[in-house]
């Protein structure tokens, strides 16, 4: 091994660039990415579990399926 095998923590590059927290806008941290804290991560999870977030469905797709069955 060259260099003794030890790495200096200041030379380690982050895995990804810091982005604003998806919940509050503060800089995200690696442990809770893309959030800044466990609190923001749990707030977002609660919104998904309570149904506050929903993936929209186009009405045209359901009408097209009905016509195919005829």
Swiss-Prot record:
Keywords from the UniProt entry: Metal-binding, Zinc
Cofactor: Zn(2+)
InterPro entries in the cross-refs: DNA_gyrase_inhibitor_YacG, Znf_NHR/GATA
Superkingdom, taxonomy of origin: Bacteria
Keyword Zinc assigned: yes
UniProt: Zn(2+) binding residues: 21, 24, 36, 40
Keyword NAD: no
Cofactor note: Binds 1 zinc ion.
Function, in words: Inhibits all the catalytic activities of DNA gyrase by preventing its interaction with DNA. Acts by binding directly to the C-terminal domain of GyrB, which probably disrupts DNA binding by the gyrase.
HAMAP family documented for this protein: DNA_gyrase_inhibitor_YacG
Quaternary data: Interacts with GyrB.
Protein name per UniProt: DNA gyrase inhibitor YacG
Organism name: Sinorhizobium medicae (strain WSM419)
Phylogenetic placement of the source organism: Bacteria, Pseudomonadati, Pseudomonadota, Alphaproteobacteria, Hyphomicrobiales
């Amino acid at each position: 091994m060259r260099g003794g095998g030890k790495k200096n923590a200041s030379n380690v590059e982050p895995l990804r660039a810091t982005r604003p927290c998806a919940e509050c806008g503060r800089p995200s941290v690696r442990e809770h990415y893309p959030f800044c804290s466990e609190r923001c991560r749990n707030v977002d999870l609660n919104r998904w579990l309570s149904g506050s977030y929903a993936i929209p469905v186009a009405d045209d797709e359901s009408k097209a399926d009905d016509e195919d069955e005829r």
